[in-house]
Structures are given as C-alpha cells and as structure tokens.
C-alpha cells in the first residue's frame, strides 16, 4: 500500500511540472480534440524524447507512474488496467495520426500505398512475455494513419510521426518530453522464431510505415533524437503540403523549458542502441549499400535510393534488419575501393540490400532525384530516407550531393552523394574528395593484416580502434664482456682496424694506441674468437714487421745531429763523471730527446705519465740485446746496473704487457765512444744474471708443501705493481727475497754516496713499484765489483736506477751492508709458517658463509687446499694441535665447547687487523705464534658480543632457558679482548701509520720509504709489510699525487654485531607449528 501511495505521489509531482509530460500530437487539430479521458494513463518512468517546437497545451491525465518493482510484478493490477483500457480508448478516439518517435534496429520497408488506398487493416495486439520489465503502451487492433510530409529548404519540415506498435524491448532512456507511446528498442529480430513475435511479423501487422522527421535545423530536430531508417511514402505529397501549412503556424508557438538540455543529451546518445557487437555483425550476411548504413547514424543529410514501381505489387512487408548491415564488405570485399576508416569514400561505397528484403524490392539501380520534379516521382517510386548526424562529419568529411537535394544546413555545404553501385564497383573517382584523402587511406591499408581492426568514425561520436599485429622478434643484443672493455669492437664484434680512435687519443691526452692497434691489425684477428688465439710470440713477430721503421730512422738521424751539442753540454756540466756512465746516459739522453719532441717536459710527477706516448716505444729498437731482453715479458724483473739506464718512458711501458722489444743492435755509436772494460763486464753480468734468474723466479705450487715456499712480501709487491705477468699468483721464491735484500742494500749504499747536487739523484715521486730479483751469486759478484771501483763512475750508473719512478720494494735500511750477514737473512726469511697465515690460503669446509667478503685480497691469490693433503702434511710435520685449525660451524658449537686459554692469552690478537695477516710482528720471537690467529678468530664465537651485551666470563655460560617447547642456550665469553681485535685496531693502525710517516719524513725526504732497516719494518708489523690496504703504497712520501690517504675497507667484526641464541628445537615461537 505504501508503494502504491508513493507511486501516485510521484505521478502527481510529474503532472505539475511545466509541460514536461504532456501529451501532444504533431497534428494540432487532433491534439485539441483530445480530452482528459482519452489521454494516456500510463507514461514511461523515464521522460521520452520530444519535439519542442510543436507543443500543445498540457492535458491532465490519470496517474500512470509506478515504481519499478510494481511494474515488474505480474500481479500489478494498476499496470494491467491502465495500459490496456486507456490505450484502447485513446487509439479508438484518434483516427488521425498521432506522434511517435521510435527507435529500433529493425526497420520496415513496405510498398507505398496508392492515392486511393483505404485505411490499412487494424493491427493485432502484440505478444508480450509476462516477465517483461519494460513499461510501454500496448497498441490495440486499431490502426493509425500516417501523415506524410513534403517540404522544401525554405520551410520547416513536417514533424508528424507515425506510432509504432509496442515491440518487445526496453524503454528508451531520453529526456525532455512525453509522447503518446513510449519509445522501445528492438532487442531481437522480429522475424526470428526465438523472438515469440512471429505473429507480429505477418503481412498485415506493420502496415504503418516509419516516417522520419526530417527537420534538419539545429533548433527543431527530432531526427537528432535517435537514428532510424525511415521510408518516405510519397503517396500523399499534395495532401501533406496542406498539413505543413497548418503546422507552420503552430510549430513555433511555444518552446519547452527543457529544450536545450534535451537537445544536448539527445545528441550525445544518438547511437546508444548500437553496441560494438551490433556494428561488427551488421553486414555479415547483408549486401546493403554502405552509404545507407552510414546515413543511419547521422541525422542532418539524406541519401536517397529510388526503386521502380514494380515493387508496389508485393504484399509482404520488407524488413531491413540493421543488425545485418556490417562493415565487413567495406573492409574485405573487392567491391570497395578504399577503406572506410576516416575516409569520405565511406559514404560513396555501395552495398546491395539485405536478402531479408524480399520479393525483389529495391533491386533497381538507384537514380537521382531532382527537387523540382520530386512530386511526380514520389507517386511512382519509393525513397529510402536515411538521417545523418553531421556533428562529426562537419569536421572530418566533406560530401557532395549529386542528387540535388537540399543542403544539410543553410550555412553548410556538405551534401551526400547518391549511392551508385556501378561507380563504387568500378572504383569511380568522381568524388572530389577522394584524391584528397588518398594518403589517409594508405594508413589503414594494413587493417586486413591484423587479427582485428575496426574503426568507424562518426557513429558514436568517438573512434574505437583495436588492432592486434604480429610483432617480429627483436634482434638479440650483443654485449661485450667487461674484460674487453678497453678493446675496440664494432657492432659485429670485429676489431676496429682504423686509426680513428688512436688519433682521437692523441688529440686529447697526447697518447697513442698505435701499438695496440698494430697488434690488432694482424691477419689472425678476424673475429671475436680470434682474440683468444693470440699470444706474446705473435705480437713479437708483429713488432718486427712494424711499419714505423722509416720514422725510427728519421728520429735516429735527427738525434745524431743534436748528439754532439747534447754531449758537450753534458760534459761541461758534469766534468769527469761521464766516462763509465756514458753508456746509460747516452741511451737516456737519446730517449729523453725523443720524449721532448713529443711531450716537451720531463716527468716530475704522477700526472706527467699521461703525457707519454706509446709511439715512442717503436723507436726503442736501438736498445741492446740484453736490454731488450730485460724489458720483455720473458724477464720477470728489472736488473740494476749500467745497462739498466733506461728512460722513464721505457720502464713505464712495462704496464702494457703486450710490448715486446726486439734485440736490434742499433746501439753501436754509444759503444764506440765508451770502450771501457767495466761496461762490458757489467753488461755480461747483467745478461748472466737475467739468464740465471729466469728459471728460479717462477715457483710452481703443485703440492701442499709447495705453499710454504711462497713469499708473502714478493707476492704482495707483484700483485700491487702488476709486474708479475707470468706469475699468475704473484709468487716469488725465498731466494728471490734474499736477492731483493742484497741488491736493495747495494742501492742504498750507492745512493747515500751520491752527491746531493747531482741532477740525476732526485727520485721521482711516482707510486709505481718494481721488484729486483737478481741471482745471489751474480748479485754478490757484481756488488763486490762495483764496490771496488772508484765510486764516481758507478754513481752515475746507480743514479740511473734511482732516477726511475719506481719504488724499490725492499725490507732493508741500514748504514751497514747486511747482505753479508747470515743473521740478516735468517731474520728476513723466517721459517715457513703453517697455513693459513703463511700461504694466505683458505680452507674450504663447504660452508655457505660470507667467506669471500672477509678476505681483503682477491680470491685469485688464494689456494684451494685439499683437506686430506693438509692432514697428511700436518702428520708429517708433527702438528697435532688441531685446536688451532678448527673452524666453528655456523650455529654448530657444542654446548660444552671450551675455548683454549692459549688462544685467549696470545698477545698477537691485540694488534691483529685481519686474521689472514697475523703473525708478522713477532715472527722472530715465535715463528708459530700466528697459528692461534687463524680463522678461529674470525669464525669462532669466542670474543663476540651476545644479545644482552652484559658481562662475560672466560668460559661459555652453562645456563639455559627452558620454555614450554624449546630450550635456548646462550653463550657468553669475556669481553677483554674484543676491542683489541676489532674497532680499536683500526685506530691503532692509523696512529701507527701516521707516526711512521712522521718518523720517516723528518730526517729523510728523498729516500724511498721502502729502503729502511729491517728492524724498523718488523717493528711496524703488518702495516709496514702488507701495503695493499692502500690503493697507492702507504710508504711513499705524502707529496705524491694522488693522495695516499685513501684506504681500502677491511672487513672486520665490530662490537655492534651479536649472535642469535641457539635454539635446540625447530620452532621459534611457542605458537609456531612444529616440523613433522
């Protein structure tokens, strides 16, 4: 009852609204004769579309608005009474035409009645399913006559419409006015057997044609309300002119207040009844003209299709189903000349009508209709009027109207072309705009190649386009490994063989890559894989065939011209100090002269190295055979002596491991001028020394015991300086260490006896380091020979070495020659230590731990030790104290594990910076003292803070926390040595390093920091020996460039870290599930 009252209240409120729901007819005479009793009692719940220019005075009617649930209820008495009785009385009292704007996607094509044709037979009531939720008027058997209009562009067009019987569907959602009948949308095909409307499609049902309201003005345009295909019946043309005259006076009497709103809404909803599926399925079985379909969705222009009079003899109606019209034929058919997407040809293409138009109707070819004789042709021909909406077409399309129809608007010039099947099939290009859009049509030619592509502009006032294209697989990218980032490769991984990159380098840095490119110019390098087949022997052969021999000869001649002036100047400055040293000085002067031609300045600091050029290396073939061998890759080290008097540039070229110098004896002009016997002895001694040390400086590690024959200091020096090219692990034998100490002390003695004002005694401050490893016998004999000489002759020879920008790695600094003392060698070469401290190798226990991050050196310097071999070695060496080698497993410490007191009392742990480098400070006291500072200190839980950060005892705590389902054991140890081996050790090391620099730089500014007494280096322990915490060696003075204060990070434990408690059950919380 409450819903009934609400429904009547709602209807009353709508009745009192200003003329919004009033009944009206296009014919004012018929609307004035209606009474309130004859008016409809039922109105749609949503206001329908209307024509605002012809509104009669409002007429009261009985309430017809109901709530939705009452309309949907089958037992609604109000619905049944109002919809039938009032409608029948209304239709019976309205013999003339009543208005109806209908929207459907099913269109009726019927034969136009003749002039004298009587009224059509009554219509049977349509069949409605009981479950229909649509609210619309049901038509009785009474028929309504259709008022036809015929207007010219100078007049307003007829606004009368025919009412269509209610068809199964839904209410049109529109706004603005109410009509006698509600607008419905056909959801199913009326001819379909599943639509339950087979009776409604009989030949006697739809005798009322669908008349389109063809007003094309923007103010009064019922055709703008919705798209429809309307058949214009020309049979009452003359009678309709009188009706037009009668309506013209009353059409503009009154304007509805909701007109502007309704027009805007209706324009936005013109194609609302057509979904995408409808448009796709429009013409799969249809041959309808595409211009007819295009005109169906626009209301401002007309396209006419005329048929012969022979179609009047047919009695059955012709149903044109809009769902059968499609764009398929325009996309794929051979009849089309261009795609329809965004093209004005869309309106000029033709399709034959659907097969559902029976009895041969509309089969004749279309003909043009002239406006002057249109009345005569309307009596004999049927014209299909299609309303077009020009809202979007005004902006996109420009059409010609060859049928002389009136224009869309008085201000518009866009006209529709007649549908000509022959012209479209033959590709007729009479349309003036076909040529203008040829380029646009080409953009859509690939629609057939895509899986789905539909683009239909001008229908929904928007463009919907979905395209799926097969995309080819992209080409795989080629990446160059980082190991070859310095090489020059093109896109095909081939080496660049031109000199462009070398010339660019010369312009920027004064450097040249001629040697690198020369080595790459070899015919053996054709592909990327050929790089792996290169060897040093191939490069040596390529060096002999270098094309720079002419340049070398030129430089030799130019040098010989200036040699006399240079020699006179040199002799005047140095007096008698040039006799025995002229061999090295001549070579050095020649090479320095060649440098000055390119660089124009000597090498005084680190940045001067970047001004060097590799081109000058090609001119060094004038070196002696022994000297070229000394600087080749076959020579593992650089020997001191007179023949070692090579320029700075020559020594620095060792960093390029590809350089192999030829033993070309272009050295004769210097030998002729210096024929002393000492030079011959020195040269032969150097040659013999290099030959003797070639085999001894390449130790091989083939078994576990060979690890102890490797020297740490030599491996550190070679790994930092990069001179250990053949020694991949950076290893030097113990004999080499003794040779280093002997030869270095010799250099020190000679450098101190050098005059301070000697121009060549100044040591260039560069961060490079070399290792000098002569044999013991040759070094001692050479040292004794040099010591017995006069001294002045050898000073120049020694100064040639001190003049080089290398740091001489040595652990000796004493005023006395300690090389003859057996105690010196015993102290320097302490007995071999057990692993891991001595060999700096790791013992892998197959644990998943962060072992690599704790090693401050590259993993290439480490050895993989077989545990079985290590155990065998320990048994032979009587090392049974396996407590020192145990690595505590992660979370695997036994509960009663007792840490050894010896490790805790070890004094070495106070100053250890890393467990890998321990034991070097007090080696002379106890060679085996660093055993306790092995990986136990890193991986053991001893000395680490626990969660509570509280006081610790020497032994682990025995207490446990027993909960309901688990037992947690906490391990605590004393905290007295935690700070010594962790955070404070870094501070202590830095303080020691600062004091070391101060002590070194106060008394001596020129002397290399590595040439010091062994006691001074041993006192400094790890920091003085293991220098690779620095990018550049820390032993150099502080005046070098770049700065030496940058340190590499050392992974260590800090006090901030703690261990988690060990839980003896898998569950971590009380409520956590247990494992099965």
Curated annotation (Swiss-Prot):
Residues 118-128 have a biased composition (Pro residues). The modification Phosphoserine is found at residues 275, 354, 403, 407, 632, 676. Residues 1-11 have a biased composition (Basic residues). The keyword Transcription regulation does not apply. Its main location: cytoplasm. Residues 23-34, 107-117, 193-206, 214-223, 362-378, 690-701, 739-748, 990-1020 have a biased composition (Polar residues). Disulfide bonds: none annotated. One of its GO terms (cellular component) is cellular bud neck. Belongs to the ZRG8 family. Involved in the integrity functions of RAM, a conserved signaling network that regulates maintenance of polarized growth and daughter-cell-specific transcription. Interacts with BUD27, GIS1 and SSD1. This is Zinc-regulated protein 8. The gene is ZRG8.
């Amino acid at each position: 009852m409450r819903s009934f009252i609400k429904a009547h209240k709602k209807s009353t409120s709508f009745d009192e609204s200003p003329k919004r729901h009033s009944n009206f007819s296009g014919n004012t005479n018929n609307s004035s004769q209606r009474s309130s009793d004859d008016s409809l009692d039922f109105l749609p719940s949503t206001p329908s579309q209307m024509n605002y220019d012809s509104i009669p005075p409002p007429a009261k009617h009985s309430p017809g608005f109901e709530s939705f649930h009452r309309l949907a209820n089958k037992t609604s008495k109000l619905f049944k009474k109002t919809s039938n009785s009032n409608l029948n009385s209304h239709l019976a009292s309205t013999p003339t035409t009543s208005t109806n704007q209908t929207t459907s996607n099913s269109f009726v094509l019927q034969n136009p009645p003749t002039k004298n044709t009587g009224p059509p037979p009554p219509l049977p009531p349509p069949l409605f399913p009981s479950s229909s939720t649509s609210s619309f008027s049901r038509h009785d058997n009474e028929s309504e006559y259709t008022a036809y209009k015929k207007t010219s562009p100078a007049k307003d067009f007829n606004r009368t419409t025919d009412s269509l019987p209610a068809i199964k569907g839904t209410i049109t959602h529109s706004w603005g006015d109410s009509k006698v009948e509600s607008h419905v949308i056909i959801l199913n095909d009326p001819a379909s057997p599943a639509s339950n409307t087979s009776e409604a499609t009989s030949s006697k049902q739809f005798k009322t044609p669908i008349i389109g309201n063809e007003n094309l003005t923007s103010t009064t345009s019922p055709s703008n309300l919705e798209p429809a295909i309307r058949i214009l019946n020309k049979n009452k043309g003359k009678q309709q002119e009188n009706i037009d005259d009668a309506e013209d006076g009353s059409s503009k009497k009154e304007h509805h207040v909701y007109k502007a709103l309704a027009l805007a809404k209706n324009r936005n909803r013109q194609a609302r009844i057509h979904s995408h599926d409808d448009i796709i399925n429009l013409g799969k079985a249809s041959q309808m003209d595409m211009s007819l379909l295009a005109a169906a969705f626009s209301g401002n222009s007309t396209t006419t299709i005329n048929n012969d009079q022979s179609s009047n003899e047919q009695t059955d109606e012709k149903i044109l189903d809009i769902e059968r019209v499609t764009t398929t034929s325009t996309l794929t058919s051979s009849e089309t000349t261009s795609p329809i997407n965004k093209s004005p040809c869309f309106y000029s293409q033709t399709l034959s009508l659907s097969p559902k138009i029976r009895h041969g109707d509309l089969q004749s070819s279309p003909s043009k209709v002239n406006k002057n004789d249109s009345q005569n042709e309307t009596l004999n021909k049927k014209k299909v009027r299609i309303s077009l909406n020009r809202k979007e077409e005004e902006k996109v399309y420009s059409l010609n109207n060859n049928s002389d129809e009136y224009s869309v608007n008085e201000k518009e010039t866009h006209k529709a072309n007649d549908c000509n099947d022959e012209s479209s099939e033959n590709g007729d290009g009479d349309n003036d705009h076909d040529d203008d859009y040829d380029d646009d049509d080409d953009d859509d030619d690939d629609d057939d190649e895509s899986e789905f592509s539909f683009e239909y502009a001008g229908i929904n006032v928007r463009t919907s386009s979905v395209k799926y294209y097969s995309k080819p697989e992209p080409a795989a990218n080629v990446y160059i490994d980082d190991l070859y980032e310095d090489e020059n490769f093109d896109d095909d991984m081939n080496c660049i063989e031109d000199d462009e990159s070398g010339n660019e380098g010369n312009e920027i840095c004064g450097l040249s890559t001629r040697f690198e490119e020369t080595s790459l110019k070899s015919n053996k390098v054709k592909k990327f894989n050929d790089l792996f087949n290169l060897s040093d022997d191939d490069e040596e052969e390529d060096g002999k065939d270098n094309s720079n021999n002419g340049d070398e000869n030129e430089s030799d001649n130019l040098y010989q011209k200036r040699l006399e002036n240079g020699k006179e100047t040199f002799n005047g400055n140095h007096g008698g100090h040039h006799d025995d040293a002229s061999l090295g000085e001549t070579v050095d002067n020649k090479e320095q002269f060649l440098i000055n031609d390119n660089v124009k300045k000597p090498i005084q600091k680190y940045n001067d190295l970047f001004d060097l050029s590799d081109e000058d290396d090609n001119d060094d073939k004038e070196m002696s055979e022994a000297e070229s061998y000394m600087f080749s890759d076959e020579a593992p080290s650089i020997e001191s002596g007179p023949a070692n008097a090579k320029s700075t540039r020559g020594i620095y070229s060792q960093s390029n491991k590809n350089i192999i110098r030829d033993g070309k004896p272009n050295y004769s002009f210097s030998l002729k001028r210096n024929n002393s016997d000492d030079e011959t002895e020195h040269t032969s001694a150097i040659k013999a020394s290099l030959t003797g040390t070639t085999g001894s400086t390449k130790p091989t590690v083939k078994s576990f015991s060979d690890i102890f024959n490797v020297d740490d200091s030599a491996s550190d020096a070679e790994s930092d300086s990069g001179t250990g090219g053949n020694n991949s692990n950076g290893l030097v034998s113990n004999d080499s260490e003794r040779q280093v100490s002997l030869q270095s002390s010799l250099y020190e003695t000679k450098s101190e006896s050098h005059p301070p004002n000697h121009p060549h005694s100044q040591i260039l401050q560069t961060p490079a380091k070399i290792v000098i490893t002569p044999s013991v016998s040759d070094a001692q004999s050479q040292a004794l020979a040099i010591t017995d000489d006069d001294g002045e002759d050898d000073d120049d020879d020694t100064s040639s070495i001190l003049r080089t920008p290398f740091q001489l790695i040595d652990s000796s600094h004493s005023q006395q020659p300690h090389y003859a003392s057996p105690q010196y060698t015993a102290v320097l070469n302490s007995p071999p230590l057990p692993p891991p401290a001595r060999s700096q190798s790791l013992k892998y226990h197959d644990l998943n731990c962060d072992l690599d991050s704790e090693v401050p050196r590259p993993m290439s310097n480490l050895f993989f030790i077989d545990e079985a071999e290590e155990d065998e070695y320990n048994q032979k060496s009587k090392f049974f104290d396996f407590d020192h080698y145990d690595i505590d497993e992660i979370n695997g410490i036994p509960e009663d594990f007792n840490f050894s007191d010896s490790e805790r009392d070890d004094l070495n742990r106070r100053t250890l910076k890393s467990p890998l480098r321990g034991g070097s400070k007090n080696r002379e006291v106890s060679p085996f003292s660093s055993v306790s500072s092995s990986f136990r200190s890193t991986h053991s839980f001893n000395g680490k803070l626990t969660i509570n950060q509280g006081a610790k005892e020497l032994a682990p705590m025995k207490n446990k926390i027993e909960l309901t389902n688990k037992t947690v054991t906490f391990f605590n140890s004393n905290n007295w040595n935690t700070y010594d081996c962790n955070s404070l050790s870094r501070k202590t090391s830095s303080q020691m390093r600062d004091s070391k620099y101060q002590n070194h730089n106060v008394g001596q500014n020129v002397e290399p920091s590595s040439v010091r007494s062994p006691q001074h280096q041993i006192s400094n322990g790890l920091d003085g020996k293991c220098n690779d915490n620095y990018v550049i060696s820390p032993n150099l003075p502080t005046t070098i460039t770049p700065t030496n204060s940058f340190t590499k990070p050392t992974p260590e434990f800090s006090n901030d870290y703690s261990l988690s408690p060990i839980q003896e059950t898998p569950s971590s919380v009380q409520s956590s599930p247990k494992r099965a």
